[in-house]
Design a protein with these regions (language model features):
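Extended, highly charged segments
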Residues: 1-58, 63-65, 69-72, 101-103
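Phosphate/anion-contacting hairpin/loop surfaces
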Residues: 71-140
Length: 142
């Protein structure tokens, strides 16, 4: 997906994810978590029982801000060429190319579907959002 499509995905995810808690994560294809330094089991552990506090976009990457009482982090998602982030009811039939499933506290699931497996998820340190408006105003004289 190109940048406008990634922004559309971000907006849709924000409506469904902010305020939700991730109860369980399943990595169904190892390539989907290949960029996570600790491997898929570490990714699962880092996300369990985390609340989604924000959904941001940095270039073509989606950043799902997550936190609990001890830790703040971000799920960094790259959609690759064919990746999709879908919201589905728990128990709905799985898509053929389902790679990661995150069960949410409201009975829905966040599903990462990627036919070509070029995309993926990794957990990274939380980074404060940049104040792009202030930056733009400071550069206006140029």
């Amino acid at each position: 997906p190109e940048l406008p499509e990634v922004e559309t995905v971000r907006r849709g995810l924000a409506e469904h994810l902010v305020g939700r808690t991730i109860r369980k994560v399943e990595v169904l294809h190892p390539r989907a978590a290949r960029r996570h330094v600790g491997g898929d089991l570490d990714l699962i552990g880092r996300l369990r029982n985390k609340s989604v506090t924000g959904v941001r976009r940095r270039g073509k990457y989606l950043w799902l801000d997550v936190a609990d009482a001890r830790d703040r982090a971000a799920v960094v998602v790259h959609l690759g060429m064919s990746g999709q982030m879908l919201i589905a009811r728990a128990g709905a039939p799985d898509h053929t190319h389902l790679r990661i499933r995150a069960s949410l506290d409201d009975g829905n699931e966040l599903r990462f579907v990627d036919q070509r497996t070029f995309g993926g998820w990794h957990v990274d340190d939380y980074v404060e959002p940049e104040d792009t408006v202030a930056q733009s105003l400071s550069l206006i004289h140029i």
